[in-house]
Curated annotation (Swiss-Prot):
InterPro entries: ARM-like, ARM-type_fold, Armadillo. Pfam families: Arm. Keywords: Cell projection, Cilium, Cilium biogenesis/degradation, Cytoplasm, Cytoskeleton, Flagellum, Microtubule, Repeat. One of its GO terms (molecular function) is microtubule binding. This is Sperm-associated antigen 6. One of its GO terms (cellular component) is extracellular region. It is found in: Cytoplasm, Cytoskeleton; Cell projection, Cilium, Flagellum; Cytoplasm, Cytoskeleton, Cilium axoneme. Interacts with SPAG16 and SPAG17. It comes from Homo sapiens (Human). Highly expressed in testis.
Amino acid sequence: MSQRQVLQVFEQYQKARTQFVQMVAELATRPQNIETLQNAGVMSLLRTLLLDVVPTIQQTAALALGRLANYNDDLAEAVVKCDILPQLVYSLAEQNRFYKKAAAFVLRAVGKHSPQLAQAIVDCGALDTLVICLEDFDPGVKEAAAWALRYIARHNAELSQAVVDAGAVPLLVLCIQEPEIALKRIAASALSDIAKHSPELAQTVVDAGAVAHLAQMILNPDAKLKHQILSALSQVSKHSVDLAEMVVEAEIFPVVLTCLKDKDEYVKKNASTLIREIAKHTPELSQLVVNAGGVAAVIDCIGSCKGNTRLPGIMMLGYVAAHSENLAMAVIISKGVPQLSVCLSEEPEDHIKAAAAWALGQIGRHTPEHARAVAVTNTLPVLLSLYMSTESSEDLQVKSKKAIKNILQKCTYLPALEPFLYDAPPNILKHVVGQFSKVLPHDSKARRLFVTSGGLKKVQEIKAEPGSLLQEYINSINSCYPEEIVRYYSPGYSDTLLQRVDSYQPLNN
């Protein structure tokens, strides 16, 4: 056998390995093939090919493993059990950029499924190597490493802290300054997932100088990048007044308000979320948002979208209104109440209705003027029907009841109160009658109208426990009228009159 024939055997073996690993990588892209591949023992075969002498075979084997691990947590668990991770981590530091990208993809695919699998990656020493990859010359390697670090950090504070301790944050801040959009996106996303867990982790992101760089990119034309930037700034802002103030000091207003008009729904939602996370902390921060035109802009945004995109804006209006009478009035003046009423009536999802009910309650609870602004939009009957409906979720019922109570206890606008005399259950009726007992003694026109509209008659029909607060309210209302008027409208009075007619003896001339 000649030398050429001998070498041909090796060439054929190499071709067969190449063909096999390429086919497996291709088959792994289709979900219907996954179980068959797993049952055929593909993991152990790919593990061997990771150590192949041919670099392209190594890279394709890593790619195939990543695709399999990405599919479900059982396959990711198999990667861990087959002891593949240490091999990947070792090669990640030694190999070329193509292999690094493929190996980082496997780590990301394993780590995304659960904290336990992410911890397995940390335990095999991958973090230090991934952080080194963030300094790689190739942007694709940086991007792959940032993906893997993000998927580890997002699970919980402990894993995030491990990523921070490995020195990832300053390098991720450098990555958001790189020209490649894809790298900027994933670096911003990783910073967001680190910051979300605790004030301390968010402070680490701030200390690395991330906020100023993120704020400068709010107007970047790439929607996905804006989505991630706004998310990262929200995750920093949400934890404390100090962190929210640091974000505000990066001069995000008024530029962030332009994002509320963006074509992309996620950009709108995340911009609303950022404004909410700032406004919720203090009256001063809410006032800053109002002064920047944030309340009016959020109300316009709520009007231009539907569903969950509306939710953070609805909550933001509630937070602003909750702080003070003046801030609640700012929401009213900006026509926030009609928009919230529309959400309450139109939105099919109970959790969005519940948020709108809560926000309306926060607006109406301050003074009679605030309560009237809510009542004139015909919101109270809608809240009552949501509270009474058996189809409403428990949370929606609770929030509707609380909103009704908040508004009723300040409401002196009687046309809005009167329908409640007929429709409200006893626990709500008490508050309605209470409001009439406050207004009627001081308003002669209202007293007359209360008689002609049938309100006084209805009050006489209410069965109240003797000595109860409700009975006190009824007595207070009755004391506003002559005794014979109260008797005239009391149940059974017509029968009494008829008895008197029957028993009356005409005087004979």
